[in-house]
Each structure stands twice: as structure tokens, then as C-alpha cells.
Amino acid sequence: MAAFQTAAQLARAVQSGETTPQQLLHGALARAEAVRGLNALVSLNSHAEEQAAAVQGRMQAGETLPLAGVPIVVKDNINVTGTRTTCGSRMLANYVSPYTATAAQKLQGAGAVIVGKANMDEFAMGSSTESSASGPTLNPWDHERVPGGSSGGSAVAVAAGISPVSLGSDTGGSVRQPAALCGVYGFKPTYGRVSRYGLVAYASSLDQIGPFARSAEDLALLMNVIAGHDPRDATSLDAPARFAVGGADSLRGLRVGVIRESLGGNTPGVEAALGATLDALRGAGAVVGEVSIPELEYAIAAYYLIAMPEASSNLARYDGMVYGERVPGGDVTRSMTLTREQGFGQEVQRRILLGTYALSSGYYDAYYAKAMKVRRLIADEFTTAFGQYDVLVTPTSPFPAFRRGEKASDPLAMYAADVDTVAVNLAGLPALSVPAGFEEVDGKRLPVGVQFIAPALQDERLLALAGALEAVGAVQLEMPQD
């Protein structure tokens, strides 16, 4: 496989007989080995060869497969039958999944071949992919810096050319932020648009599977495959849609609202990229204005006061009795204590403790219940803003990739990395990070992203916008040097 070809190009090559699924798989594996030092993947799919052969057989039998032979990487919290699903944790170091997540199953049904599982922050709790039990993932643009998180491995797999597309999960920005820091597209669909069945839960009311890609066409291609109602997920929406890219003409008259609260505290490179993107939109005939969403001031606090309690509940099942690596301790209580002490990393333990505290008697109303009220206010303010504008825009992250270890010992600084993304999850909206430029830091060019937000169930509007931005030259997509 020629690194950095798009999924659409590879699928067409297989469909025309120019190449085979097996050849694409071998190319992806060779590329994964070449960039092994980035630590993007935590495991390879031992069944990939037979899956590639099966795709070839289906093609020969006359099946039309939109992702024919396309190699793909999925985050290590998305279950795939017969592969380890560790969630970046010692707790699940040897867990082999007996079933496949709906999103991954749909990819395989469309002809994709799952190459392996991508590294991640432990249980998706982080913004840097430093807390994984498999070690940190490195940013391909500067190996001394983080790729973002928690889906850092999925972002790096696409940015470094292992696979043209990948799947991650986004609870508070975990697809969009690493996409921005690695210079690729990252899309968070409307909550419920993609089934969560088979996704290991972090915060169930916020989690959403989403794709990474190097082209707008590939985003649309993946969403046409993975979106749709799933009776196995009670939060899944029955809202059929056809995803397609738009042309430059679609920007004429588009109402774009810049969220005023996102304009402070950004680095010069982020400000420049946002400004250039807005100039391109104006030049193509879009109407650009500003809109205020005052309650965003409380988004980070509300997000963590909701996510942490949900995490404390979801992770209660890992006690070594049914789930998790059991540590013997004499009696059951001691064994459970040791299992959780040794199985969970520091950040996961911190969030479980804070979440349990926020739900405890006497504090529930003061913290969790109040955060839920703020969540409702934020959602209402977004609805009001969409009465004036078709899409809203912010930086994806206020800064480019930071150095490894720079924020690891300062939880509040790490949490602030999600300042532009968490509100979208609180409101359940779709959002897209577009690679929008670069900022030079210490002699290295680091990618930055711009985030576009649409009303609920208007996901296709964002993918059409991505294609239009490509058409007017507003997307800055480059390949990092090995």
C-alpha cells in the first residue's frame, strides 16, 4: 500500500483489480513496522490475513463493497472478536473480546480489514495518550510531544500513514483534539448517530464513536457505513441520512458564527489558522459573525462533574471477580482492593474517587445535579445560537501539541486542554475538527485545527462543509516526515 492514499482511492483500486485486500494489508503492516517507535498500535489483528482473503472472495462472488480491502485501525476500547481489548489498562491486560462492536462489524461488512488496535489514554481518561499501560504514543510531527488524547493512537495511525482512516471515541474531545494536534480530520457525530454497542463505557451519556481521516470524502464514506440505528444500543437514533461532500458553491450564503468565548487564550498559530479559515469562508461567500454562549464558562466544570460520576459507576464492575485481572489478597474485600489499586492507573483512580464523592449523600445536589442543570443551559444556548447561524466555529484546541510530561502532573492543566470541545458532548451535537494550519514551536511545525459545530442530526452539513473547505483551499493537510 502506498502510504497516505485515501480509503476511497484504495477501495477503487481493489474494485478495479489494480490491487488486492491482501496487498493492502501487507502494506499497512509494513508501514506500522516502519513507524513502530510512535507506539500508535498496541496489538495487531491475528485474523487480518483471513479477513483480507474473505474480502477477496466476496469481491470475486460479485459483492459490491464500499470499503473493499481498506485497512483500518480501531481504538482499543472498541471490541473486536478474538482480539485483546485492553482500554490502555493493566486491569484488562489479557481480556480477549468474545464479540465485535456494531461499528467495527459494519466496517467489516463493508469490506474493511481491521489491522490492529490503537493506543489510548487508560479507559479514555486523558488528553495526551500518556497514561496507557502500553506506554505513551508519540506525535509524528515532533516525537517529544503528545498526539493528544484519548484517541491518540487512532490519530497517529492516520497521520503516519498506517491506515487511511481509523475509529476513535469522543467523550469530551477525544477524537477532535488529537485530530487537531496530529493534522488530520476528526469527526464527533451527534450522540446516538453511531451505535455504542461494543464500546467500553467511560461516561455513557457523553461517549460517541467517531472517525479520523485524511479527506472529507473518506469521512463521508465511513459515516455512510457506521451510522444508523442499532437495537442493541438503547441510545441509538433512527435517523437515516446520506453523507456526501460539498463543493465551493455550497459556502455561498452559509451563516458561520464564531463563538466569542473561544477567542481568548489561544496561541498565535491557532489564531492565525482560525483567521485564515474565516477569510476563506468569507471569500467563498459565507456570512461570518460572532455569537456569545456565556454558559461555556462553566462547561469544563460541568463536564467533569458529570463524566467522573458516570465513570465511577461504569468502572465499578472491574473488581477481579468477573472483569479485570484479579490480584489475590486473602479475603474477597482485600482482593478487590488490591485489584483496583494495582489495576487502575493514577488518573483513573482520581476520577473514580472524585466521581464517587460527587454522587455521595449530601453532595449529589451540590455537584452532579447542579452540573446537569448547567448542561441543560448550555444545550439551550446552542439552540439559540443555531437560530442565527448554520454552523458555529471555534479553535479545536487553544494550543498545538505540548511536550510529553508537561501537563501530566497537573490535572487541571490537562483538563483545560478540552476547553473548546467538552460543551459539544454536553449538548450531544456533531462537531468536526479540520486541519487548518501549522504553528512553529522550537523549530518544529506543529498542526492546529479549527472546529465546526452543527445542530443535532445535521452531521451531513459538517461533512459537506469539509468538502467545500477542501475545494477553496482552506484545509492544510500535509504528511509528517518519518
From Swiss-Prot:
Name listed for the protein in its UniProt record: Glutamyl-tRNA(Gln) amidotransferase subunit A
Family from the record: Belongs to the amidase family. GatA subfamily.
Cross-referenced Pfam families: Amidase
Record's keyword terms, sorted: ATP-binding, Ligase, Nucleotide-binding, Protein biosynthesis
Gene name in the database record: gatA
Catalyzed chemical reaction(s): L-glutamyl-tRNA(Gln) + L-glutamine + ATP + H2O = L-glutaminyl-tRNA(Gln) + L-glutamate + ADP + phosphate + H(+)
Species name: Deinococcus radiodurans (strain ATCC 13939 / DSM 20539 / JCM 16871 / CCUG 27074 / LMG 4051 / NBRC 15346 / NCIMB 9279 / VKM B-1422 / R1)
InterPro entries named among the record's database cross-references: Amidase, Amidase_CS, Amidase_dom, AS_sf, GatA
Gene Ontology MF, one: ATP binding
One GO BP annotation of this record: translation
Coiled coil: none
Catalytic residues (positions): K75 (charge relay system), S150 (charge relay system), S174 (acyl-ester intermediate)
EC number: 6.3.5.7
Cellular component GO terms held in the UniProt record: glutamyl-tRNA(Gln) amidotransferase complex
Keyword set includes Repressor: no
Subunit structure comment from the entry: Heterotrimer of A, B and C subunits.
Job description of the protein: Allows the formation of correctly charged Gln-tRNA(Gln) through the transamidation of misacylated Glu-tRNA(Gln) in organisms which lack glutaminyl-tRNA synthetase. The reaction takes place in the presence of glutamine and ATP through an activated gamma-phospho-Glu-tRNA(Gln).
